[in-house]
Amino acid sequence: MEADASVDMFSKVLEHQLLQTTKLVEEHLDSEIQKLDQMDEDELERLKEKRLQALRKAQQQKQEWLSKGHGEYREIPSERDFFQEVKESENVVCHFYRDSTFRCKILDRHLAILSKKHLETKFLKLNVEKAPFLCERLHIKVIPTLALLKDGKTQDYVVGFTDLGNTDDFTTETLEWRLGSSDILNYSGNLMEPPFQNQKKFGTNFTKLEKKTIRGKKYDSDSDDD
């Protein structure tokens, strides 16, 4: 009986909250409609023109990004190409990979998805064997590593899968949240609420730039099978 009463009470509380939310949405819509009704023709025309300008600007920005190679996950052939790619785009994610490292292939799949969703960010990959100078300069020692660059400068790193839950089964949303935490893409969710089911399991300690040290030219693998 007590359990049934608790469920009934919870249902009533939930119903009340839904009604309150619906009421607030309706009030907001009514307010917006009232504002439109009170506008004269000139004001409506200015509002229409303002929105058209915003749409044109957004379309121009999209075309500019696409012309610079955004919207797809691309491999660059050498470290020389890296500098030009980074120079022309505000936000860049570069995956430093190695063919023999299994976890790099896992990242490839998620990055390909995000590249199409986030046109504001350029997504690249570079084989570490073809970029020894760059890897030393950026302190790339663990494979895979994502270098996150803003305005041509390295802002953060995602080293291995530590920040992604130390599991091969992390979701694309988890990687998206991690990149959003570094302001390298436009994240629409709440950064204070990571898409983890178990926060204690996954943790929240990110790999910071200042912790990187050069220990030689051998690359460590984050994959168990490598």
Curated annotation (Swiss-Prot):
It is found in: Cytoplasm; Nucleus; Cytoplasm, Cytoskeleton, Microtubule organizing center, Centrosome; Midbody. The keyword Nucleus applies. It holds the Pfam family Thioredoxin. The keyword Repeat does not apply. GO terms for molecular function: cadherin binding. Its main location: cytoplasm. Residues 74-180 form the Thioredoxin domain. InterPro entries: Thioredoxin-like_sf, Thioredoxin_domain. Keywords: Cytoplasm, Cytoskeleton, Nucleus, Phosphoprotein. The modification Phosphoserine is found at residues 188, 221, 223. GO terms for biological process: microtubule cytoskeleton organization. GO terms for cellular component: centrosome; cytoplasm; cytosol; midbody; nucleus. PANTHER family: THIOREDOXIN DOMAIN-CONTAINING PROTEIN 9. Significantly diminishes the chaperonin TCP1 complex ATPase activity, thus negatively impacts protein folding, including that of actin or tubulin. Forms ternary complexes with the chaperonin TCP1 complex, spanning the cylindrical chaperonin cavity and contacting at least 2 subunits. This is Thioredoxin domain-containing protein 9. It comes from Homo sapiens (Human).
